[in-house]
A protein has these predicted regions:
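Extended two-metal-dependent nuclease catalytic cores across DNA- and RNA-processing enzymes
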Residues: 1-143
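Charged, low-complexity intrinsically disordered segments
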Residues: 145-151
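Long, highly charged low-complexity segments enriched in Glu/Asp and Lys/Arg with interspersed Ser/Thr
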Residues: 153-155
């Protein structure tokens, strides 16, 4: 939440560039102009310029993909029966997770469509959990953050 707040308010804090150092791909939700994530595990950096080397969706579509497929590491359930390929197809057809939610019930007899129609209420809940930027100030209390510049004395 603190990283999301700094990304959201980078102009306010006069931050030219933000490197997020983490192996957690959730932080890729924060990648934008002048914000990248470096994985200390893979030794690779994710930027807007090389985004397509890492993902089959746009940065804007990434949150929708995560809303539909979930995130086991963060205990965010996806829609049963919907993996990345099916999620990508739905995103391409409807635009984003919220538009999919708005179109429920979806027509079709496939099991994953039936599952989506039965579990669609999970979409806005997942969106709120995954949307780091929108909800970061509520989570940390924006008034509790300050940026200290200069050399810090270790003593």
């Amino acid at each position: 939440d603190i990283a999301a707040h700094l990304v959201k308010e980078k102009e306010k804090y006069d931050l030219e560039y933000i490197w997020l150092i983490s192996s957690d791909k959730d932080w890729d939700l924060l990648v934008q102009n002048n914000v990248s994530r470096f994985s200390y595990v893979t030794r690779k950096e994710v930027t807007l310029e090389n985004w397509n080397d890492h993902y089959d969706v746009t940065p804007e579509e990434y949150i929708s993909l995560k809303c539909l497929t979930g995130d086991k590491g963060d205990n965010v359930p996806g829609i049963p029966g919907i993996g990345p390929k099916r999620a990508l197809g739905l995103i391409k057809e409807y635009g984003d997770a919220i538009s999919i939610y708005d179109h429920v019930p979806l027509p079709g007899k496939y099991k994953y469509i039936e599952s989506l129609n039965e579990n669609y209420e999970q979409i806005p809940q997942n969106y709120e959990l995954m949307d780091l930027i929108t909800y970061c100030d509520d989570a940390i209390g924006a008034d509790n953050i300050s940026v200290i510049r200069g050399i810090m004395d270790a003593a």
